[in-house]
């Protein structure tokens, strides 16, 4: 069975896989560049009045939640990332196009952060968005993809 015949037999794969791998690869490459550029030695780079590049190790999940959870949380979040990604893949034939796109973004981001947890025991964050003195918690490409994917998923359900 060739790849093209597999794609034809599994509806949505031709959209899911490119988006999934684009998110995953962009996330991992950006994190490696940031590890080399701003993590060792730690330094801060101002990009403009709204954006900085900063070195942040996140041992929890979004916004640093569950950061003190230790090994159990790390394992749980990693298992959850693979479970959610597997669910999206399994559900592909039943999903609408926008949901496939959203699922691919969420899965790619989830696996990107899971790879960090497996490699480092924590996640590499480096994007610091701020308005004046108010700073959004540092995030990465995977987090952005998960957030965009969740927004697209919600939109697909509501409209």
Name the predicted role of every residue range.
Residues 1-159:
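Alpha-helical transmembrane bundles and membrane-interface segments of multipass inner-membrane proteins
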């Amino acid at each position: 069975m060739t790849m093209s015949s597999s794609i034809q037999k599994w509806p949505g794969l031709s959209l899911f896989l490119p988006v999934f791998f684009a998110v995953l690869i962009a996330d991992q490459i950006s994190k490696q560049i940031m590890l080399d550029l701003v993590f060792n030695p730690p330094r801060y780079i101002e990009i403009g009045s709204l954006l900085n590049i900063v070195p942040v190790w996140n041992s929890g999940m979004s916004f640093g939640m569950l950061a003190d959870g230790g090994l159990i949380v790390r394992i749980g979040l990693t298992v959850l990332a693979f479970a959610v990604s597997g669910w999206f893949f399994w559900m592909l034939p039943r999903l609408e196009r926008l949901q496939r796109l959203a699922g691919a973004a969420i899965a790619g981001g989830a696996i990107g952060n899971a790879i960090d947890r497996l490699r480092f025991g924590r996640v590499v964050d480096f994007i610091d968005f701020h308005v004046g003195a108010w700073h959004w918690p540092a995030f990465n490409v995977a987090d952005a993809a998960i957030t965009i994917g969740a927004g697209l998923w919600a939109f697909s359900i509501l409209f």
